[in-house]
Amino acid sequence: MILSVNSAWLERFQADRPREKDHRPPFRRDRARILHSAAFRCLQAKTQIHAVGENDFYRTRLTHSLEVAQIGSSLASQLRFTEAFTSLTEQLNCSSKELESVLKPLLPSNDLIETLCFAHDIGHPPFGHGGETALNAMMRHSGGFEGNAQTFRIVTKLEPYTEKAGMNLTRRTVLGLVKYPAILDEASPQYSLLDLPHPTDLGHLRQIDWRPSKGLYRDDLTMINWLLKPLSDTDRRLFTSFRKVRSNFQEFLKTVYKSLDCSIMELADDIAYGVHDLEDAVVVGLISQSQWQAAYDELKNCSSDWMRKNVDTLTQKLFSDYHYERKNAIGALVNYFITHVRWKMTADFTDPLLRYNAELPDDVICVLNIFKDFVFKYVIRDVETQRIEFRGQRILTDMFQIFESDPERLLPRNTVKRWQNAEAEGRKRIICDYIAGMSDAYALRVHRQLS
């Protein structure tokens, strides 16, 4: 059996011949477009964990993305080793050598996986989840807002590398950035049918009411259809399907499937979130060893033999007074996750980029989830973090209403042109794009000018 990647995945929305004597492969050109974009540069001014932002050590969205790229490249390299094929070899009852010869050519190049990891957060608005909440509430009747959907919109429309196709990346690169291939307003709660506090009442804009679902904007349907054109009808229906059928108006629906490249990028993001964000929080004293006890107990009793054996040493090093010991523990954890990555197959797909994914075994995923849940509980949900995000939430909601009240007077000239050229029902999206593209500091500065 020989699998090959459909040449359509190398196409761009607009024909784009390399310049004279430019011999770079397509994904290296994509990588350069991300690195030189304003959206990527803006990540340096967006904080990864707001509560640690007063410390010089803290990570930004930019440094986080660089670390995700390093982990992603390591995962892709690890998938070339024989042990990564063992589980699938047993499942298919075939030789490892045969499977390796078939699957290795499907793996993303280092240029491609780094491109995806560099770009994966560029759609996140200022003030993290607080910003998402504010913009989703303000866009509730206009398609909603969500960070991953905004990433898709930036690379396919907003970033001014071309007039109308954004960065004009290869189709495979764009596919790798799509974590949730459904339309956002179909995945979101049916807001018009719910009795929720009016979102312009800033005192009652609760995150639990207005946190976004996951998907892509209906406004970008032309690019979505272009992206999925190489898929068979059967593959497209399965790829865009939800995990379950909606049973009530409040439900958040999620898709199940991702491309091979996206699965590698998402694992890298999860590892960086679970391990490196924990490192930040320990160093600045956001979490204590007594708080860690609950996670320690779970790790001590988890199904991973390696973790049960090493959790005491890891804990001692993680909370050591010596930075090199903490770094040693962090390195050991990252290595543990990377070296357990393996191939996974979903036989219902025919396109090989959807049929095969990267995954971690159940016992390793269990460990990663313990780390992620701990970071969420003690770092993301930390009261200082939540107060900063809530402040940002109020700022963005206020700014949106101000800009909407007199857009031709208050928006920048280029944004005004886009607003004037948009259909009436699409004008809110133009305001949303402008606010979502701000850094934390710039949003504060603009709001002060308007207040």
From Swiss-Prot:
InterPro entries: dGTPase, dGTPase-like, dNTPase_2, HD/PDEase_dom, HD_domain, PHydrolase_assoc_dom. GO terms for biological process: dGTP catabolic process. Keywords: Hydrolase. SMART domains: HDc. Signal peptide: none annotated. Residues 61-274 form the HD domain. Transmembrane segments: none annotated. One of its GO terms (molecular function) is dGTPase activity. It comes from the Bacteria. Gene3D superfamilies: Hypothetical protein af1432. SUPFAM superfamilies: HD-domain/PDEase-like. Pfam families: HD (PF01966), HD_assoc (PF13286). Belongs to the dGTPase family. Type 2 subfamily. NCBIfam families: antiphage_dGTPase, dGTP_triPase, PRK05318.1. This is Deoxyguanosinetriphosphate triphosphohydrolase-like protein.
